[in-house]
């Protein structure tokens, strides 16, 4: 439906080969559109990346869009869909806004992730929109780690892992691990030890100018740094991960002008019964706000 509406409006729709070759897509309207094999070909001359799916789909599309500096618009087909801008039941309205260029672009902070071996040599590099999770390679046993901020040690502990997150990622894995929610307008790096066995295991909110590092203290157990849940970098015993603010943000297509607070309450279904704030009183006095 989305591709057809855009095509009817005279907009060139490009479909990656992997999507077009899907058995369902083979017998659908997707077969009509330009098929490209590489993301760079799809991005050539494009205005934005349209994502239909849940948060996992959005993160994979953001990986492609980030590489070519294109804005991303997410339409939620999943459950919570925190990263999506719009719900699927309003798809037609969202596409009309895209066709009319009635949207704005918001930059979301990213992380640069560098993995170094025990001798200080770089052995891997990547980036994350949500978070990087440092954990045991086989995901069994305890990760023996030391947390470091700006070249100074903070704490050593055994844990299931250490999460280093952006404000955008604070509502994802870091939130499930007990971290706070950071508003996306805030520039900060969030550090959340995951099930740490130590006295000091509280989440930390660190300056975006800082370098956060996690060292693996084991001489025998390998670890891995997993970015956004699907881009792993192996870490040999004794290696470390250094995380800084990314140089390039992800460009987010915004259609909705409502504040993040409303989004948080709606997506997490937070109870706000009994609220009597000034805005609520103003809404009650304005008959146009009813319904």
UniProtKB/Swiss-Prot annotation:
Pfam family of the protein (one): NAD_kinase_C
Cellular component GO terms, alphabetical: cytoplasm
Entry's localization field: Cytoplasm
Residue ranges crossing the lipid bilayer per the database entry: none
Gene3D superfamilies: Probable inorganic polyphosphate/atp-NAD kinase, domain 1, Probable inorganic polyphosphate/atp-NAD kinase, domain 2
Reaction catalysed by this enzyme: NAD(+) + ATP = ADP + NADP(+) + H(+)
Keywords, alphabetical: ATP-binding, Cytoplasm, Kinase, NAD, NADP, Nucleotide-binding, Transferase
Residues at the catalytic site: 55
Chief localization: cytoplasm
Isomerase recorded as keyword: no
Highest rank taxon of the organism: Bacteria
Recorded GO MF terms: ATP binding; metal ion binding; NAD binding; NAD+ kinase activity
CC cofactor: a divalent metal cation
Paired cysteines (S-S): none
GO biological-process terms attached to the record: NAD metabolic process; NADP biosynthetic process
Top EC class for this record: transferase
Enzyme Commission designation: 2.7.1.23
Family, similarity comment: Belongs to the NAD kinase family.
UniProt xrefs under PANTHER family: NAD KINASE (PTHR20275:SF0)
Name of this protein: NAD kinase
Organism: Corynebacterium glutamicum (strain ATCC 13032 / DSM 20300 / JCM 1318 / BCRC 11384 / CCUG 27702 / LMG 3730 / NBRC 12168 / NCIMB 10025 / NRRL B-2784 / 534)
Source lineage: Bacteria, Bacillati, Actinomycetota, Actinomycetes, Mycobacteriales
């Amino acid at each position: 439906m989305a591709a057809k509406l855009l095509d009817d409006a005279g907009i060139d729709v490009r479909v990656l080969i992997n999507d077009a070759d899907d058995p369902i897509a083979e017998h659908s309207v997707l077969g009509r559109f330009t098929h490209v094999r590489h993301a760079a070909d799809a991005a050539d001359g494009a205005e934005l990346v349209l994502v239909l799916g849940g948060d996992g789909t959005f993160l994979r599309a953001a990986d492609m869009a980030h590489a070519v500096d294109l804005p991303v618009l997410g339409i939620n087909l999943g459950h919570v869909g925190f990263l999506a801008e719009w719900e699927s039941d309003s798809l037609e309205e969202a596409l009309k806004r895209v066709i009319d260029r009635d949207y704005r672009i918001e930059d979301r902070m990213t992380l640069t992730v560098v993995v170094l071996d025990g001798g200080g040599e770089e052995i891997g590099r990547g980036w994350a929109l949500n978070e990087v999770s440092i954990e045991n390679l086989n995901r069994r046993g305890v990760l023996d780690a030391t947390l470091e901020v700006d070249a100074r040690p903070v704490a050593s502990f055994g844990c299931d892992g250490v999460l280093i997150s952006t404000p955008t990622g604070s509502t994802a894995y870091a939130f499930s691990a007990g971290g706070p929610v950071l508003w996306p307008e805030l520039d900060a790096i969030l550090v959340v030890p995951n099930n740490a066995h130590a006295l000091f295991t509280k989440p930390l909110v660190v300056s975006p100018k800082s370098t956060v590092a996690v060292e693996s203290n084991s001489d025998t157990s390998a670890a891995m740094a997993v970015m956004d849940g699907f881009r792993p970098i192996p870490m040999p015993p004794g290696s470390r991960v250094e995380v800084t603010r990314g140089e390039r943000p992800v460009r987010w297509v915004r259609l909705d002008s409502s504040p993040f607070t409303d989004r948080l309450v709606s997506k997490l279904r937070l109870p706000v019964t009994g609220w009597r704030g000034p805005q609520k009183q103003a809404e009650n006095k304005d008959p146009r706000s009813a319904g």
